[in-house]
Regions:
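Residues marking the start of alpha-helices
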Residues: 1-2, 62
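N-terminal helix-turn-helix DNA-binding core of bacterial DNA-binding proteins
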Residues: 2-38
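Key DNA-contact positions within bacterial/archaeal DNA-binding proteins
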Residues: 41
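Short, hydrophobic-biased segments on the C-terminal half of alpha helices
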Residues: 47-48
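A short, conserved structural fragment
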Residues: 51-61
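Basic, amphipathic "hinge/linker" alpha-helix immediately C-terminal to the N-terminal HTH DNA-binding motif
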Residues: 62-75
Length: 75
C-alpha cells in the first residue's frame, strides 16, 4: 500500500484539483497554478508527489485525474 499521509500543502493541491475537475471536467497544470496562484514548477513537483502516493493520475501534458483514494482525501 502506498503512503497516503500528506502535508496540508499537498492537500490544498488535491482540493484545488477536485474543484477544477468539478467545474471543468478536467484539470491541467496551468489551471491548477492559476487556481492556487503559484508557479507551474511548484505544481509539477506537487503533482509528482501526489502521483507517487497514488492519489492522482499524472502524466506531463495531459489532464490530471484523481484516483479514488485522492478523491476521498480531497473530500
Amino acid at each position: 500500500m502506498k503512503n497516503t499521509t500528506i502535508s496540508s500543502s499537498l492537500e490544498d493541491y488535491l482540493e484545488a484539483i477536485a474543484e477544477i475537475i468539478e467545474e471543468q471536467g478536467h484539470a491541467h497544470t496551468k489551471e491548477i497554478a492559476d487556481h492556487l496562484k503559484v508557479k507551474m514548477p511548484s505544481v509539477t513537483n506537487a503533482l509528482q508527489a501526489l502521483s507517487a502516493r497514488g492519489l492522482i493520475h499524472y502524466q506531463s501534458h495531459s489532464p490530471v485525474f484523481l484516483t479514488p483514494a485522492g478523491a476521498e482525501t480531497a473530500a
